[in-house]
Amino acid sequence: MNTKTLAILITLLTCVLIGAPAHDAVAQFNAADFEYGDRFKMADGETPEIWNPAMRKLLDGGPMIGGTVRATDPRTYCAMAAAGYDFIWVEMQHEATTWEQVSRFWKTCPGPAAPGVRVAYADEREIQHATDMGAAVIVVPTIDSVEEAQEAVNWTYFPPIGRRSAGGGQGMSEIWNEVPGGYRQTWNDNVVLILMIETLEGVEAAREIAKLPGVDGLFAASGDLGNFSGFGEGDAEYEAIITEVATAAKDAGIHACAPLRWADRPEFTCFQAATEGANIRRGAAAELQQAAERFGSSGGGGAGRTASSAGPTLANLTAECSSITYEADCFSAVESAAEAATSMSDSDKALIGRRVRELIAANPSQASQMRSIASAGGLDVG
């Protein structure tokens, strides 16, 4: 080995043993230390435009009312959207409606009611499908924990509140491109996120869930809270559960939501109204009632005809409660029947009471609530 080679080896060995001269180290990127930029912030002195009518109702203190759509026909959706609701609750938890069908609804009739949806569960795919296609109200069912609630927040909101993606070519651009202030800049101030408390675990976690930034309302799911508790309306145990959910929302400064038939309970300020099917039946029943009263009093359409005022109400009860597919519609029909019976003759009132008793006997799972609703309306069902 010559002298030059030996010198090189000694130099290399020295570098290994005592370390080579240090270069300036580059710190590893740490996302937690990153400060979010100003690109989407409002200028000093500016406030975000509220273009979502549902959010405007909540900011004004409510009530915010959403009509429910289960059908897949855009004409039916458009009729509901024009009926005066603040938003439309498209049902996708318990229906086989596709996102393509829902997108057609919203593109055809983006208003006057804000487009909304109850998704099937709290995950990125479900919620971003909804928001990317134009939903401005997101209802998420069966939230049992703070972690599940945070998932719903994450996929509903853009950063820095959530983790919603801002990919290009989203369907909502056809609906919301022209909103004042810009969609991306004002979305976090306009979207309404409602989380449904449906189980005992959800009730236990309700107070912590309600405190999460981004949650606008807790929905006390009247049917499933009875399903999971084994109690019904009027039972002390059931009412305590409902009160716990409403109190959790109130203490956190957000809204407590419920079926519209609870509109007389002051703790609730946002509501789910009946389905399009129930509204069609009610509209038809009202029209037929008017015809029956006219023909019965004037003899039109048949001399000497007499009309029973119970007919349309009985038909609605039968349609909604003989084979229950949506509890809220049946309960609403019972409530309407009890109210209608107050102005009927004794014989017609007896017909209504008898039919409700038959339906109570035929639906043991809903019997307690049906009986409670009827009794609260002054209808004797035994």
Language-model features and meaning:
Residues 301-382:
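General marker for long, soluble alpha-helical cores
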Residues 28-308:
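Expand to "…catalyze enediolate/carbanion chemistry for C-C bond making/breaking, isomerization
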Residues 20-26:
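Sec/Tat signal peptide C-region and signal peptidase I cleavage site
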Residues 1-9:
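Bacterial N-terminal signal peptides that target proteins for export
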